[in-house]
């Protein structure tokens, strides 16, 4: 008897136009997955990422959605599944910062980061889990940060959002393990992206000095971990946190 062929998997990456999100899209495409590149405002960058994925021999689309809105997340997941006939992988990567010291931080500053980084992941995960549960297969990966583990001055909002992602994924992992759906978290350290490039030179130098490997990581380093957790062969790994930090958290 011939074994049934494994279907081509499809992935949705939020905040997929640039940085870690773009690298994740390309890494998953290199594994043969069709890719939905979500973006909020950078349409040209998202279309370029989708085109680069197609150059790797897969289907890819760019989908605009504001992950702060639950109805937009539901529609985003439905559109991604409709584009490819299924949805197997969700990467919650969309994130923002609004750094200020505690006494200067307003409620609006705090809410803006929580709404995108944490609530956006909740909304997308809830919508995707419904589909994945029915097909009895799914991989959900959220991009946290070492800041969510260790904290950082001037980032109470960001730290709270990234710590929240770890708890969110562990709880989802327990709820959906019996349905063939895994939920894991990656925690990047100091990674060279547009966000870190905007830091003062002295701050970047200090961050690099705190890394045992002596240098910042690349988006591709994080993407490799995401692709690992999104794969067929890692179905017995769930509820875990994988740090990609060059030893920074030791």
Name each region found by the language model.
Residues 10, 17-19:
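Conserved glycine-rich cofactor-binding loop
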Residues 43, 64-76, 107, 220-221:
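The beta1-alpha1 cofactor-binding region of Rossmann-like NAD(H)/NADP(H)-dependent oxidoreductases
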Residues 86, 177, 182, 237-239:
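Short, small/polar-rich loop/turn modules that mediate ligand/substrate recognition or access, typified
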Residues 101-102, 106-114, 196, 207:
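Substrate-binding pocket helix/loop in short-chain dehydrogenase/reductase
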Residues 125, 161, 169:
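Active-site helix of classical SDR
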Residues 130, 174-178, 235:
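Alpha-helical segment proximal to the catalytic Tyr-Lys
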Residues 145:
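Residue(s) in the substrate-gating loop at a strand-loop-helix junction
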